[in-house]
Amino acid sequence: MPLGYWGVMGNCFRRLSLFGQPTQANYEMLCSSDDLESEELTYFLDMTYKDFGVYQNDIISHQKDTETMKTLLGLLPMYKKTKLRHTIMERCLSNCPNHVKDALCVELMKAEKILQTMDVVFMKTLIGEFSMCTDNLNQLLNKFATDQSTLSDVEKINSLIEIDGENSKRLLVELDPILHEETGLYQALPNVVTEAPSEKVKSIHVESEGESVWSSVTEGGIMKQEKGTGV
């Protein structure tokens, strides 16, 4: 080990001063680059989202989820780079010549769009998206859907969950293709669809008081119901 360094229990310490009698107080523990990146990410998320009610303890609890942290760590450099560009352009806008101002405004709007989109990505990656298992939904319907009003309400909730997921993906897809070329945002996000979702219809069958009820819900939230006599 080089002079001025010593190791104990798998940790590496560096001596702060080569003068005087060495004691434990003269050393600092070295951290790996991964630890520093994780600390930087935690600080960034805490400073950015604490006003929304996402606190440091909430962020730290996600550190055990390696895939979530890996995604967030991959997005952070892109966010910082775009934020720096946005700050510089915003500062230059008031003093730049008129023949430059229009082009600068376009670039500024691009940066704002990227930052807004990444805010959504960070937040949804951090807190997770709400979802409901189809089996659980069917159990709820069979247990509680004693009338058409309840059936309609539950189906609308499920439809809204699906629409929210599609809108989140569409938000990324609708970014200007130039932004994608500049940032590689799509590659940084796994499982992002690149086509607008087609209209889907889901049907759930519930029997209540001798009646057979079929309820269909489109992604637009339109309810279609048919009744028939149970066999």
Swiss-Prot record:
Disulfide bonds: none annotated. The keyword Phosphoprotein applies. It is found in: Virion tegument; Host cytoplasm; Host Golgi apparatus. Pfam families: Herpes_U44 (PF04533). InterPro entries: Herpes_U44 (IPR007619). A lipid is attached at C12 (S-palmitoyl cysteine). Phosphorylated. Palmitoylation is necessary for Golgi localization. GO terms for cellular component: host cell Golgi apparatus; viral tegument. Its main location: virion. Keywords: Host cytoplasm, Host Golgi apparatus, Lipoprotein, Palmitate, Phosphoprotein, Virion, Virion tegument. Plays several roles during the time course of infection, including egress of virus particles from the perinuclear space and secondary envelopment of cytoplasmic capsids that bud into specific trans-Golgi network (TGN)-derived membranes. Oligomerizes. Interacts with U75; this interaction mediates U75 incorporation to virions. Belongs to the herpesviridae UL51 family. This is Tegument protein UL51 homolog. It comes from Human herpesvirus 6B (strain Z29) (HHV-6 variant B).
